[in-house]
């Protein structure tokens, strides 16, 4: 069963849901989607009954969590979501694995009164309940903290309009130590036995130590082969404390030598805004299908012939949210990339993006990813 919700869903996902007659909650967003692809729409009552028997549900957006909270409130899954969405509770639960990890939950009022000299900088400041990189700040110096507090105040009302409280809650924040190492994202699910099944692993590429953007992620044969077993052991160990089963998760971690430290576990979904589809363009894996049908990828077979290739998801975020998508020269992108597998134009006022591109890049041509990562994208905007 699937819950579709704003702000975006890919045609690739809709095509799968339509062709396989997957039960989809009948809400306003799903009705709009059904105009493009015939969908097996079911009522809230039917969805609840289905969940009681099948114990498996996938959401394409964190906006769908409101329905889960309202309709499955007595179910164990809501308790698990609350723990995973609340970053302070999450840190507390995993503290036996990371006894020396510094974190502190704090209100906005307390944030304005904090003694900077007492902070163990560098630290990360973010909403206790958050999504993507919205409201995430790296704090090195006092001026960074002051700028973050000002930005929080300036964006408070806008974030309330854009995201439900279940997605981003700006009433509480968490200060936590900066995690060293290379950042990776994992799309996986825990099966009915609590065993983790990894569907994709991609690294988060940054332009500088202070960069917190979501511009570039990529996956490759080397990444999968290097980290799949390690991350499976990590997910197995964390589940001794989390006790998850029959749930999809999008996990972000940092790896520093032998240390794997979680940034966050995002429940009920894979990579947001249908960016999980990078697994399909790289490896032919429809992640939603693998979760719903309890499938496990045979990476030994899948990765054959994928040597020396990088498969990227590139977010075309607006440098200025007032720029209309009509000014963006999408065709110009083809001059800068070796092989664009799919270009997704997104003209949605609630999203400050022009769209996404999925690319295949030869390892020796990684400079094209470095280029787009450092670009402010104004060069693609017509005057």
Q: Which ranges hold each PLM region?
A:
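Conserved N-proximal alpha/beta basic substrate-recognition cap immediately N-terminal to
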Residues: 29-119, 131, 361-374
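Conserved metal-phosphate-binding beta-hairpin within the catalytic cores
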Residues: 239-276, 303-322
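ATP-dependent carboxylate/phosphate-activation module, predominantly the ATP-grasp catalytic core
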Residues: 177-180, 187-243, 266-295
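Conserved ATP-binding module of the ATP-grasp superfamily
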Residues: 100, 142-180, 237, 241, ...
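ATP-grasp fold ATP-binding core
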Residues: 94, 119-139, 158-181, 186
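Peripheral (often C-terminal) accessory segments that flank ATP-dependent C-N-forming ligase machineries
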Residues: 292-383
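Short, charged N-terminal beta->alpha structural module
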Residues: 1-37
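Glycine-rich phosphate-binding loop of ATP-grasp-fold ATP-dependent ligases
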Residues: 123-153, 183-185, 207-223
